Regions:
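Short, conserved clusters of charged catalytic residues that mark active-site
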Residues: 23, 72, 144
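Flexible, glycine/small-residue-enriched loop-and-beta-strand segment within the central core
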Residues: 47-56, 61-135, 162
Length: 169
């Protein structure tokens, strides 16, 4: 059998890869997340509006190009759960005030309501999924790509669509 040849280009590639991985881990730890568990991975670029309200438990993974809009609501992802690219999390919602245009109200009078989003253990979330305020995804559930989760998903269910509907449990 032939030996694997380590050409200078291959060595440079691996060194660059290792450097970028270490640099990425340092950046994530400096974000000030509420919890960043052991072996958790938050791939960059990811936009988080309030990092102190994001809780990633052990062995969780969120791939890059994700956006988490959370001002007072919390986003909690428990052990062994993962999300593919372009996850969109929105913990806030606002109710319109009848008779008064929204843009005319001062910020203190806007009827915003933020609710926590909880992803239980061992959940798979596909690419381009949107999680809206109050969503609770049960243990072992699978969320299909491009789904809109606006209600609770029971444990060990497969949910797809916009809005999500249960196709298997």
């Amino acid at each position: 059998m032939g030996k694997i040849k380590y050409t200078p280009m291959r060595i440079v590639y691996h060194l660059k890869y290792l450097y970028l991985r270490c640099k990425e881990k340092r950046k994530v730890k400096n974000l000030g997340l509420g919890l960043y568990g052991k072996h958790a991975k938050l791939a960059l670029p990811t936009v988080i509006s309030n990092p102190s309200h994001v809780f990633l438990h052990d062995y969780t993974r969120i791939h890059g190009q994700s956006i988490i809009y959370n001002y007072t609501g919390k986003f909690i992802m428990k052990e062994y759960s993962g999300a593919s690219i372009e996850l969109l999390v929105v913990t806030g919602n606002h109710r319109p005030t009848v008779g008064i245009p929204h843009y005319m109200l001062p910020l203190s009078r806007i009827n915003d309501k933020e609710t926590d989003i909880i992803v239980e253990e061992d959940v798979w979330i596909g690419a381009r999924v949107t999680l809206l305020a109050g969503a609770h995804i049960g243990r072992g559930a699978v969320i299909g790509a491009s789904s809109l989760v606006n209600k609770d998903v029971p444990p060990y269910a497969v949910a797809v669509g916009s809005p999500t509907r249960i196709v298997a449990s």
